[in-house]
């Protein structure tokens, strides 16, 4: 068991400064699997190395997706390594051969956690979820279930369930995304409203959104130029004498 600080220093550089120069990268399997099981930021950082071993060296990691699913907690939208995590999660969930229940569980948990996420994270995760729907059409029952019940007394999805197959995600619906359609940030509300329509076949490019920050959003809003200057919340329809005219209620020519 290494100190947490040392784990982080090694894992940050492992995938590009250590593994490519090893004659037998598979020797790092035990180290990475132990690090992946620790949890928190260390598990997130271990994903990079594991990704290389799984895809380039045929590493078999039992319950890999169960562990990846367990990493989804409220902090995932706030951690320093958020961009790296979602980049790798996007790669791991890119296969069209993944079972629908597994992808639905990821979609549902990401959506539930999104209810308390900051706008900069929401503008990234909503297109991320849309891409999962494009890859796995069977999950679209979460937004459109033709033969489903008219209403539900409660959400069947079990957020606390650690096993994705037992979470009952496919029986649920994405009411969380519908809630985000009323978000205070107009860009978030607009992004969430995309699911009200048929999705295009082409995936959204989220690479430019992974490292989006609150400062960038603020600067974007500050630099916006208003087309119409907001002078009054109720437009004047006339001057004196017209029925129900606000100006005439307070002033008179007499």
Cite the ranges covered by each PLM segment.
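Extended alpha-solenoid helical-repeat scaffolds
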Residues: 1-95
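Eukaryotic scaffolding regions of large macromolecular assemblies
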Residues: 58-254
